[in-house]
């Protein structure tokens, strides 16, 4: 199986270099500082959990490398409103174009359509992307531990925190978890999809959950389709979930979101 993450890093670094030429860091930093203040991503999730509810990070994703086009009638503002009406706590919006047909404009439009905090879902390799995310209104960014060394992860996290943003630290195995726990952000996302093979199993979350300290906020990501999947992960202490594809494919996204969030 080809190493998908390595291929992605190659084109992302080309994208970043091009973006820096088009819009220098100083200009983007000024835009980030002038942007409306971040909506508390982690705080919103904790408030949902404190009420005894599941906390759903609902994903807006047009396509994926493994499945191709997910939704033809793709309208980020409508999807954002549908997720909000269905009970989602936060939004995640794909902004990567080559693999996911995403765009920063999709995130801007989704955030403007709701009051929910928004995660920029992308492959972050450079602090420039963090500042760029805030300049476009992002409330949270993703750090994929498999994609970064410790120094890069620390620098990217520090940039996000300095801008008032939250960070979702994504892991897939014990080694990545141990590295993530050295960082400051409380949210630890366990990706049930192996980013090097794109194979998915909930056993990944079940196996790693016992090693995540209780004061951290565990997030289950990928391979989550039914209320039974949520109940299965809840049994190992995960009550926050990032779900995209299974909801994006439904005709009535609001109804599908409500159905998913019903406690088993």
Curated annotation (Swiss-Prot):
Keywords: Amino-acid biosynthesis, Aromatic amino acid biosynthesis, Decarboxylase, Lyase, Tryptophan biosynthesis. The keyword Amino-acid biosynthesis applies. It catalyses: 1-(2-carboxyphenylamino)-1-deoxy-D-ribulose 5-phosphate + H(+) = (1S,2R)-1-C-(indol-3-yl)glycerol 3-phosphate + CO2 + H2O. Its EC number is 4.1.1.48. Transmembrane segments: none annotated. InterPro entries: Aldolase_TIM, Indole-3-glycerol_P_synth, Indole-3-glycerol_P_synth_dom, Indole-3-GlycerolPSynthase_CS, RibuloseP-bd_barrel. PROSITE patterns: IGPS (PS00614). Gene3D superfamilies: Aldolase class I. One of its GO terms (biological process) is L-tryptophan biosynthetic process. Pathway: Amino-acid biosynthesis; L-tryptophan biosynthesis; L-tryptophan from chorismate: step 4/5. It comes from the Bacteria. GO terms for molecular function: indole-3-glycerol-phosphate synthase activity; phosphoribosylanthranilate isomerase activity. CDD domains: IGPS. The keyword Amino-acid biosynthesis applies. Disulfide bonds: none annotated. Pfam families: IGPS. NCBIfam families: PRK00278.1-2 (NF001370), PRK00278.1-6 (NF001373), PRK00278.2-4 (NF001377). Belongs to the TrpC family. This is Indole-3-glycerol phosphate synthase. It comes from Nitrobacter winogradskyi (strain ATCC 25391 / DSM 10237 / CIP 104748 / NCIMB 11846 / Nb-255).
């Amino acid at each position: 199986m080809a190493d998908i993450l390595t291929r992605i890093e190659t084109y992302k670094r080309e994208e970043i270099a091009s973006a820096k030429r088009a819009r220098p860091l100083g200009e983007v930093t000024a835009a980030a500082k002038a942007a409306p203040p971040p909506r508390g991503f982690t705080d919103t999730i904790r408030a949902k959990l404190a009420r005894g509810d599941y906390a759903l990070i609902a994903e807006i994703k047009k396509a994926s490398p493994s499945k191709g086009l997910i939704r033809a009638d793709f309208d980020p503002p409508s999807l954002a409103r549908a997720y909000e009406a269905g009970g989602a706590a936060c939004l995640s919006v794909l902004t990567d174009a080559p693999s996911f047909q995403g765009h920063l404009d999709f995130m801007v439009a989704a955030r403007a359509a709701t009051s929910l905090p928004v995660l920029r879902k992308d492959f972050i390799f450079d602090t420039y992307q963090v500042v760029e995310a805030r300049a476009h209104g992002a409330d949270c960014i993703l750090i994929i531990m498999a994609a970064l060394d410790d120094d890069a992860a620390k620098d990217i996290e520090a940039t996000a925190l300095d801008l008032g943003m939250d960070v979702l630290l994504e892991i897939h195995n014990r080694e990545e978890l141990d590295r993530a726990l050295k960082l400051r952000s409380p949210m630890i996302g366990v990706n049930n999809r192996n980013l090097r093979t794109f194979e998915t199993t909930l056993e990944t979350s079940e196996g790693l959950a016992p090693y995540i300290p209780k004061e951290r906020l565990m997030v289950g990501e990928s391979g989550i389709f039914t209320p039974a999947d949520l109940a299965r992960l809840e049994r190992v202490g995960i009550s926050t979930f990032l779900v995209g594809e299974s909801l994006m494919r439904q005709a009535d996204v609001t109804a599908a979101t409500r159905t998913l969030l019903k406690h088993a």
